[in-house]
C-alpha cells in the first residue's frame, strides 16, 4: 500500500520506518525543510535504538521517502497517518492546533479515496472533529474514512515494541476501513483489537494513566519503606510475583517524565473535568510524581545542610535511558532547584546533552565522561539509569571524590555493593549506607 505519515517526530518517524520495513511504500511529510533534508541523508532527528539503521535501509530500497510538500506527499496515498504533536496547554488540555491544520491540509490535497488514521494521542471526540474538518474543506469528490490507531511504544525500545507489541488497537465503526487496516498491519503478526473510535481514543489515555499510577504508587510505598526500615526492592519483587499485579512499572525512583505520562495524565484530568467528573485519583498520581522529583534534592539538603557553593554532579539527564528525550525529565526540576540554591552543577549524559542545553539552567557545566563530572565534586546525584552509569564501579568514586557521597535516584547499586565500596550512599526506599566515621 501507499502510506503517508504526517509528522516526523517520535511517533511519526517510527511509524513510517516500521511500515516501510514490512513492505509498504511510505512518504513522511514534515514542514521542517532542514529536518527533511537530514533524513534524506540518513540522519535521524531522534535517538532511538535501531531506528536510523532501518531508516537508511528502507530509504536505499526505495520504500521510504521524505517530503515537505503536502501536494506531492498526499497525491498517491491509500492511507494517511496523522502523527503530529498534541502538546500540553498551560491549563492541562491538549493543544490540537497541529491536528486541525493536518486535517485541513489533507482535505485540500487528497486526490483519491483514503483512510485517515489518527496516530497522535488525542482527547476523546477528536476524530469526530477531524472527520468534520476534512468533510467541510474537501477539495475533491473523494471518500474519506477516519479511524483511530493509538500507539503504545516505549521510548528506548520503540522499534522492538512495534514488531513485538501486545496489541494493535483500531477504532472504527466501518467494516471496510477495519479490513483495510487489518491488512496493513497483518505482517506485524500482533493481535488486533477493533473497537469504536471513542473507546480507542480512551484506551490510550487510560493505559498511560494506569501505568503512571503504578509508578506513583510504588514511589509512595518506597517513601514509607524508608521510614519503617523495609527495602523497596524486596517489596516490589514480592508484589510483582502476584500475576494480578505484575512486575512491570514497580521500579521506585524519582518519578516519571517524557512526552507521554505527564501530558496524558494532565489531559485525562481535563477530559474528566469537561464532563464534570473530578478525577481525584489521577490528580494524586500527578502530585506524588511532582513531589518525588524533588525528593533527591531534599535528601542532599538534609545531609549537607545546604548546597550553596557545593559542586553537585548529575549523572544522566534524559527522562529514561536509551533516549535523548528531555521532555519533563526529572533532571530539569532537580537542576533548576540546585541552581536556585546557588550550587555548582556538573552534568553527564551519553546522548542527551545537546537537548539538555536547551532546557537546563545556563550555569550547568557539561562533561564528556562520568569521571570528569564526578572528580572533585561534593556529591553525586544519579538521575538516569543508563548502562554506563549503572556499570560505573562504586570503588571509582573513592578515587574521584574526597568524601564519596552518592544520592541514587534510580537504585542502580545494591546496598551490599555500596557497603563494600565504603561510600556514603542514599537511594530510594532503602536504608542509607553510612561508613563508620562519615560526617552526617
Swiss-Prot record:
Domain of life of the source: Bacteria
Catalytic activity: UDP-alpha-D-glucose + 2 NAD(+) + H2O = UDP-alpha-D-glucuronate + 2 NADH + 3 H(+)
Binding site for NAD(+): 2-19, 30, 35, 121, 155, 263, 327
Keyword Lipid biosynthesis applies: no
UniProt note on regulation of activity: Competitively inhibited by UDP-glucose. Activated by phosphorylation, which may increase affinity for NAD(+); inhibited by dephosphorylation.
Matches recorded under SMART domains: UDPG_MGDP_dh_C
Sequence positions that bind substrate: 151-155, 204, 208, 249-253, 257, 320
Metabolic or biological pathway: Nucleotide-sugar biosynthesis; UDP-alpha-D-glucuronate biosynthesis; UDP-alpha-D-glucuronate from UDP-alpha-D-glucose: step 1/1
A Pfam family hit: UDPG_MGDP_dh
Chain coiled-coil ranges: none
Location in or out of the cell: Cytoplasm
UniProt EC number: 1.1.1.22
Alphabetic keyword roster: Cell wall biogenesis/degradation, Cytoplasm, NAD, Oxidoreductase, Phosphoprotein
GO cellular-component term (any): cytoplasm
Main location: cytoplasm
Active site annotation, chain numbering: 260
SUPFAM superfamilies linked: 6-phosphogluconate dehydrogenase C-terminal domain-like, NAD(P)-binding Rossmann-fold domains, UDP-glucose/GDP-mannose dehydrogenase C-terminal domain
Family designation: Belongs to the UDP-glucose/GDP-mannose dehydrogenase family.
PANTHER family registered for this protein in UniProt: UDP-GLUCOSE 6-DEHYDROGENASE TUAD (PTHR43750), UDP-GLUCOSE 6-DEHYDROGENASE YWQF (PTHR43750:SF4)
Name this protein carries in UniProt: UDP-glucose 6-dehydrogenase YwqF
